[in-house]
Amino acid sequence: MPGRHVTDHQMRLFMKYRQTHSVEVAAAKASISRATAFRMEKEQRLPSQNKPPRGRRRPDPLEHIFDAEVVPLLKAAPGIRAVAVYDEMLRRHPELPEGIRRTLERRIRSWRAVHGEAQEVIFRQTHEPGRLGLSDFTDMGSLSVTIAGQPLDHLLYHFRLVWSGFEHAHVILGGESFVALAEGLQNALWSVGGSPLYHRSDSLSAAFRNLDADAKVDLTNRYEELCAHYRMTPTRNNKGVAHENGSIESSHGHLKNAVRDALLMRGTRDFDDLRSYRAFIDEIVSRRNAAHGKRIDAERPHLQVLPERRTTDFEEVVVTVSRTGGFALRKVFYTVPSRLIGHRLRVRLFDDRLDVFIGGTHLLTLPRGRAHASGKHDQVVNYHHVIHSLRKKPMALLNLVYRDKLFPRPEYRRAFDALIEQLPDRQACKITVELLALAHDRGCERELAEELARTLDARKLPDLMALRAIFGPDPDQLPTVHVQLASLNSYEALMGSAYAGEAA
């Protein structure tokens, strides 16, 4: 058409039709003029090849600085970002316009493509069923999940079979550790019903942090023994090279997005307790596995048979109960019944609990505490363990190290704050300790807390005598109840004379 450039496609059409038609017919079919057709027959070159190279239409703002300053900077620091080079050039040459950033970034990218260093290559792998399982941990802090209104600082242990895409996730309250790995891995293997030939994890650098050489060797041996129990060969990807675990790293993002969407549809990120949140995670993972159900069923026959029983998924430590009525373990102080003072206890550390044994007898289970990120010690206190001694020395409550952890519910702390503000310290401590003792003796912790809340909301102080009358009345003042048993003849009358005659 007049006024339009001839395209390469039009020339190809013309040359095609020219093999069987005249110049005029071929030109008409290619939508070009007769004169253009005769000219194209002589040139035998595509129109795009006849275009002269496009030159610059405006001055090059980097003409005097790129080779002289930018290139030496790129050679000296190959990993430097283009935006850092841009800021440095503006600092050196304030007269440069700020709009050169994109030009500089394109020029640096082109220079690196020609003169840059060789980059690491990722080699895609083919996978066989039943061959490889992957484990990793992912941080769930960005989801802002809360338990009973309190933020839940937790990780998610994530296991995945590479071939079928089977997944298992387990909520971890502490950081990365062998205990968390052992518990999560065994749950995953027993859930799928078999074990792969190889198990790959990262270098477990977080679990090895702050350990001495002997402890690191012990942890390595325990990990190898765990894999040997399930006849798996342990492998590790190189430290800091996430793409070597890419089959699970990418799955982290998909799983977290699924959890985030489920939380949005749920309408709240708060859960009543940890058990309900774990059930919520299990349901999401189950739905994801259902989408790969056929492939998972196809991989199961290729998995190794599981052993008869699980192996240990805990650490065992021996502690001695001190005169303070508890023991310190991993920067956390735990209270135990005072009758255990002086005894040596075996403690099994799980991710979320401690099982306490004396000899081979299980004594009690304690929730596991965590030291603060700043290194400050924490306490796990059960007031039932110390209340009998505290009643003898109520003033010890005033400056007690773990006073804040002693109160089983916020209402008791509110009551103590109100009492200490309006009464002498000795009287306030005495009343608070007696309130805790009342809850301990009568098993009315929740009911007493509700009554304290009503009293404090009415801007009154707790009345110990009145509360004792409600929850712990004096047995001597209880009314005598006389129970009169009914005569058996009255029951026979209810049965009727006809039935009585038949029985006779």
From Swiss-Prot:
Keywords: Plasmid. It holds the Pfam family Mu-transpos_C_2. The keyword Cell membrane does not apply. Residues 36-60 are annotated as: Disordered. SUPFAM superfamilies: Ribonuclease H-like. InterPro entries: Integrase_cat-core (IPR001584), IstA-like_C (IPR054353), RNaseH-like_sf (IPR012337). Residues 125-309 form the Integrase catalytic domain. GO terms for biological process: DNA integration. PROSITE patterns: INTEGRASE. This is Uncharacterized protein y4jA/y4nE/y4sE. It comes from Sinorhizobium fredii (strain NBRC 101917 / NGR234).
